[in-house]
């Protein structure tokens, strides 16, 4: 008997017992949600009415299964307890986040707690226990890419289409674009009557020629759902350049496909579709293709995708100009720097030309979104530049307000803050659009 206990103790580490206990406990907590009303979870009375016997039963079953896995010959050398901790932590946080959202809506405090919880699990299993991804077959990356694309397309296209049929659109913008595409199909141009309550070209509000890329498909299938599907296709197509960029940096096929999966799960892209079709749905794919072309030093694709990005919206020139500036200041070949200078200059010229068109023939460039930075007698661009150089503290005080801080955590926090950590200072230039377009404006939809 003593020999048995000696061998048993030698085969397992104390940390593995703890991981197994936590994994079984978390799995049990999620499973008993099926036997309790969801509305009672975040309530002090839940503990008094919890199904204790079921909790104990599920815990015993899960702990037993995890223990059995340790004695299966093929799994003996695998860190099954580490994997179980990661999986159970993920499913627990997702399940309780869904319950929290249904019961109380978005809660940044709960989100931060979830991030800390997941970080500890990842640090212990990946950092301390050195768990590694299992060996995949050579073609497994194709399945990961396909599943990621299907998931993203279903969420951004199918879910939004079903919401349209339920008449659950959140604002009247979808009516604007449906009418606009119908008029474009009939040869009347991007004309609407509901955007400002009189006949008006949408390009007098936002200059977005890229909409004509969607027109052939709408002409073939003239229905509002077509627009929802096209939105999903454009957003989902960004999976491909993400995969190619990862491959350019030397990641394996499976790791590159996992980057694409992260893209598919990133809420800033999928959640952005919840306001129905807007021109911004084309930005992620065009920008990622532009970055891929820059990384591969492909001249024609770089110029093509820079042009496509510019046609999305007047302020899309900011993204192109910043990428050009980044290429100029980063450690690149002379050819790439020259191309960076070209697209930077072209983006600036295009931006000022479109602004002049909107100010003279349209409704203006909506400079009121930056009214907090415009001093008396100052123009928009001048005011922003002068304020940035003479009073940066004022800008910082406006950037880190409650809702904007929440938005920053939601967008950068889910990426582990990686965009904020780099040894190459030129990369921080790429944060300019995030600050200028999302955080600085007073328009609330820029940080939602």
List the predicted regions and their residue ranges.
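Hydrophobic, aromatic-rich transmembrane alpha-helices
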Residues: 63-72, 394-398, 405-435
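Start-transfer (signal-anchor) and selected internal transmembrane alpha helices
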Residues: 1-26, 60-156, 339-343
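Extracytosolic helix-loop segments that constitute the early lumenal/periplasmic catalytic or substrate-binding loops
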Residues: 158, 176-201, 209-210
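Multi-pass, polyprenyl lipid-linked donor-dependent membrane glycosyltransferases
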Residues: 105-110, 230-236, 261-294, 308-319
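Transmembrane-helix motifs of polytopic, lipid-linked glycan transferases
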Residues: 62-71, 225-250, 289
């Amino acid at each position: 008997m003593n020999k048995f206990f000696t061998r048993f103790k030698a085969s397992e580490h104390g940390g593995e017992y703890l991981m197994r206990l936590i994994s079984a406990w978390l799995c049990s907590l999620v499973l008993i949600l099926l036997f309790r009303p969801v509305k009672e979870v975040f309530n002090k009375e839940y503990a008094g009415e919890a199904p204790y016997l079921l909790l104990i039963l599920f815990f015993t079953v899960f702990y037993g299964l995890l223990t059995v896995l340790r004695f299966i010959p093929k799994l003996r050398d695998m860190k099954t307890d580490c994997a179980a901790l990661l999986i159970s932590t993920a499913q627990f946080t997702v399940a309780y986040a869904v319950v929290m959202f249904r019961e109380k809506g978005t809660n940044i405090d709960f989100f931060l707690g979830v991030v800390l919880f997941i970080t500890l699990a990842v640090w212990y299993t990946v950092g301390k226990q050195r768990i590694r991804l299992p060996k995949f077959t050579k073609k497994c990356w194709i399945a990961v890419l396909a599943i990621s694309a299907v998931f993203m397309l279903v969420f951004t296209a199918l879910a939004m289409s079903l919401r349209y049929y339920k008449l659950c659109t959140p604002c009247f913008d979808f009516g604007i674009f449906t009418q606009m595409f119908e008029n474009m199909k009939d040869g009347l141009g991007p004309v609407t009557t509901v955007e400002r309550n009189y006949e008006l070209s949408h390009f007098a509000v936002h200059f977005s020629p890229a909409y004509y890329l969607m027109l052939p498909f709408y002409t073939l299938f003239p229905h509002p759902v077509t627009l929802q599907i096209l939105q999903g296709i454009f957003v989902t197509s960004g999976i491909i350049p993400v995969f190619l960029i990862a491959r350019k940096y030397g990641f394996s096929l499976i790791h590159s496909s996992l980057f694409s999966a992260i893209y598919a799960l990133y809420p800033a892209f999928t959640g952005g579709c919840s306001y129905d079709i807007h021109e911004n749905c084309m930005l992620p794919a065009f920008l990622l293709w532009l970055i891929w072309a820059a990384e591969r030093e492909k001249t024609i694709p770089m110029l093509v995708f820079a042009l496509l990005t510019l046609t999305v919206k007047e302020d899309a020139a900011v993204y192109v100009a910043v990428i050009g500036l980044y290429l100029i200041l980063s450690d690149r070949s002379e050819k790439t720097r020259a191309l960076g200078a070209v697209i930077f200059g072209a983006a600036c010229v295009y931006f000022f030309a479109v602004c002049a068109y909107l100010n003279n023939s349209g409704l203006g460039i909506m400079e009121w979104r930056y009214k907090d930075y415009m001093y008396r007698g100052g123009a928009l661009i001048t005011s922003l530049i002068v304020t940035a150089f003479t009073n940066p503290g004022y800008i910082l005080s406006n950037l880190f307000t409650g809702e904007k801080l929440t938005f920053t955590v939601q967008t950068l926090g889910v990426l582990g803050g990686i965009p904020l950590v780099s040894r190459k200072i030129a990369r921080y230039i790429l944060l300019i659009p995030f600050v200028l377009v999302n955080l600085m404006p007073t328009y609330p939809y820029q940080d939602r």
